[in-house]
Regions:
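Short, small-residue-biased leader/transition segments that mark boundaries at the very start
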Residues: 1-8
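Histidine/lysine/aspartate-rich catalytic loop segments that bind and position anionic ligands
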Residues: 47, 53-78
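Charged helix-capping and loop-helix junction motifs
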Residues: 81-91
Length: 158
């Protein structure tokens, strides 16, 4: 889908833009972000959103099916976007259940740090830049490298 980001979790698809696709293709739900911060008027399905602080997670947790917390590590694709949390803050948030199975780690996730995500108590990891860097949509035609890398990450996270 051109101009749309998709998140796949447990073989279910959430659209981050073009919310009409949710109904048209019976997708799992929609994801709210700064560009699309409100759900459609009569929408009643699965909703997730991105948060940028632990307080925001705590305040929004009861209103959404799950949340992304970002940036956990320095962003791979956006220069100057650095980690918003210390390891101790994340450990403590996991112990106090602010971070739990409904909170997904986003930002700078790579094979070097994906195992830490489990230790902090996150329900999963959102991998973007690390995968994007494995494939150039303008020049590459062979998806095998990005598929291999995804499988490697998935195996590490399982």
């Amino acid at each position: 889908l051109v101009g749309s980001e998709m998140c796949i979790r447990d073989r279910r698809i959430i659209t981050h833009e073009h919310f009409y696709l949710q109904e048209e293709f019976s997708l799992m739900g929609i994801h709210l972000n700064t560009r699309n911060s409100k759900e459609p008027h009569d929408y009643s399905g699965h909703i997730s959103c991105t948060c940028h602080s632990l307080d925001e997670v705590q305040n929004k947790k009861h209103f959404y099916d799950y949340l992304f917390l970002s940036p956990i590590y320095n962003c791979i694709t956006k220069s100057g976007v650095t980690s918003g949390f210390t390891a101790e803050e994340l450990r403590q948030a996991g112990k106090s259940k602010v971070i739990d199975s409904r909170v997904m780690a986003l930002g700078g996730i790579t094979p070097d740090n994906i195992l830490e995500i489990k230790d902090y108590g996150f329900g999963g990891a959102v991998v973007m830049g690390d995968l994007w860097n494995k494939f150039n949509a303008c020049t590459d035609r062979d998806y095998l490298e990005v598929i291999r890398h995804f499988k490697k990450l998935k195996k590490m996270a399982d």
